[in-house]
């Protein structure tokens, strides 16, 4: 089974949002909705371009 990781732009109530998917599973999604598709895509491109190799920060305090 070939499941891929991808970003998706979709409509929600007439506004645009993005989400990160792994096959049918949603891993992350935008907190904000955008009236303009270009604005949504611009923010998504920043997330995509800046996220590779970033550290995981655990703020739970659990071992």
Residue spans for each PLM region:
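Extracellular/lumenal glycan-associated surfaces
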Residues: 14-26
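Short N-terminal "domain-start" leader segments
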Residues: 1-15, 29-30, 46-50, 55-58, ...
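A short, exposed loop/beta-hairpin motif centered on an aromatic-Gly-Thr core
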Residues: 25-36
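Residue-level recognition of oxygen-bearing side chains
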Residues: 39
